[in-house]
């Protein structure tokens, strides 16, 4: 009996020793939880990441503003632009025309570019000028390309402020569509008789639009060195539509709609007078619709300033030498 008791005691001691060892061992760590995954990018969302550095660095000379005009408009339209907003952005602005003009060349210098495109307002002539604009921008090395027409007033400060909220390395296509729905076009497939239907948004050139350098470089296979014109023939559309076709239809990027761009196609009198000076571009109706102008007062009558561009300019830059002194007073809006 005592022998059995001794065996049991030894067993108990051995068990106690094992338990003691187990208690001294470190507890196993729990398995690590899986790292949270970043949400998938939303294709419709405006990219906003890592913009602080670019905002602080964006300078006026980072922007390439292309003004499309024609020889017959050098007098009535272009001189007004040179007198107003271009005088505040001379190094940013490049004038693309279709005829030599020694007098204008003296005013604009090397910023005036004769595209040698046809002066007839056809789809092919418009695309010819856009092709030259694109190539000159790529050659310039600047960060942003902005296209406007010769009936646009550009507010350089508002433009720079808007572009500073984006990165030029990202795919940015910024402007205002003239339609409330995507355009539908027939895309002719090269090397065959087949065709496809494509739908895409485009920013109307009459209001102006901007492209980041990152996106413009991706457009190169369809836009550089004359390729733009052959691309336009695939859909048989004018220049601004072709830009939208390349960006949305071929590259899969998206137009970012902005209400700050304005063309003569909209009712400009509906633009609140208090918001006029914050817009990026303005326009006017012209002889066929002379009353379609922004509602802004000032020191010039409608007869003196039918486009209202001089009035807008003097409100933005009252120190301009030809602006009336009273324009520097209190309120100028109606």
Curated annotation (Swiss-Prot):
The enzyme's E.C. designation: 2.4.1.222
Transmembrane segments: 7-29
Residues given in the record as Mn(2+) binding sites: 151, 264
Cofactor comment text: Has some activity with cobalt but not with magnesium, calcium and zinc.
Active site per the UniProt annotation: 240
Required cofactor(s): Mn(2+)
Disulphide-bridged cysteine pairs: 117-128, 146-210, 314-323
Topology, Lumenal side: 30-334
Catalytic EC class: transferase
Organismal lineage: Eukaryota, Metazoa, Chordata, Craniata, Vertebrata
UniProt name for this protein: Beta-1,3-N-acetylglucosaminyltransferase radical fringe
Annotated Gene Ontology cellular component terms: Golgi membrane
One MF term in the entry's GO annotations: metal ion binding
Catalytic activity: 3-O-(alpha-L-fucosyl)-L-threonyl-[EGF-like domain protein] + UDP-N-acetyl-alpha-D-glucosamine = 3-O-(N-acetyl-beta-D-glucosaminyl-(1->3)-alpha-L-fucosyl)-L-threonyl-[EGF-like domain protein] + UDP + H(+); 3-O-(alpha-L-fucosyl)-L-seryl-[EGF-like domain protein] + UDP-N-acetyl-alpha-D-glucosamine = 3-O-(N-acetyl-beta-D-glucosaminyl-(1->3)-alpha-L-fucosyl)-L-seryl-[EGF-like domain protein] + UDP + H(+)
Tissue distribution of the protein: Most abundantly expressed in adult brain. Expressed in most neurons of the brain but not in glial cells. Also detected to a lower extent in adult lung and kidney.
Keywords attached to this entry: Developmental protein, Differentiation, Disulfide bond, Glycoprotein, Glycosyltransferase, Golgi apparatus, Manganese, Membrane, Metal-binding, Neurogenesis, Signal-anchor, Transferase, Transmembrane, Transmembrane helix
Record gene name: Rfng
Short name of one Pfam family: Fringe
């Amino acid at each position: 009996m005592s022998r059995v008791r001794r065996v049991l005691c030894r067993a108990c001691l051995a068990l106690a020793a094992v338990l003691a060892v187990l208690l001294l061992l470190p507890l196993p760590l729990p398995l690590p939880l899986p790292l949270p995954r970043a949400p998938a990018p939303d294709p419709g969302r405006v990219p906003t990441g890592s913009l602080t550095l670019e905002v602080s660095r964006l300078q006026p000379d980072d922007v390439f503003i292309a003004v499309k005009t024609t020889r017959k408009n050098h007098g009535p339209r272009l001189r007004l632009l040179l007198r107003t907003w271009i005088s505040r952005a001379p190094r940013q602005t490049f004038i693309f025309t279709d005829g030599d003009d020694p007098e204008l060349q003296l005013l604009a210098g090397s910023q005036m570019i004769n595209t040698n495109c046809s002066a007839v307002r056809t789809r092919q002539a418009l695309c010819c000028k856009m092709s030259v604009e694109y190539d000159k921008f790529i050659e310039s090395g600047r960060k942003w390309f902005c296209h406007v027409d010769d009936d646009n007033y550009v507010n350089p400060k508002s433009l720079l402020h808007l572009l500073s909220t984006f990165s030029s390395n990202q795919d940015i296509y910024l402007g205002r569509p003239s339609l409330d729905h995507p355009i539908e076009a027939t895309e002719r497939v090269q090397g065959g008789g087949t065709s496809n239907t494509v739908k895409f948004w485009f920013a109307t050139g009459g209001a102006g639009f901007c492209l980041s350098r990152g996106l413009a470089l991706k457009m190169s296979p369809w836009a550089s060195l004359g390729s733009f014109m052959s691309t336009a023939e695939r859909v048989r559309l004018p220049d601004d539509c072709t830009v939208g076709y390349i960006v949305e239809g071929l590259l899969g990027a998206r137009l970012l709609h902005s209400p700050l761009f304005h063309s003569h196609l909209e009712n400009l009198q509906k633009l609140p007078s208090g918001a006029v000076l914050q817009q990026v571009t303005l326009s006017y109706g012209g002889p066929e619709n002379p009353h379609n102008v922004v509602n802004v007062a000032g020191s010039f009558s409608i007869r003196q300033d039918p486009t209202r561009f001089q009035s807008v300019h003097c409100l933005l830059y009252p120190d301009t030498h030809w602006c009336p002194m009273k324009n520097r007073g209190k309120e100028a809006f109606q």
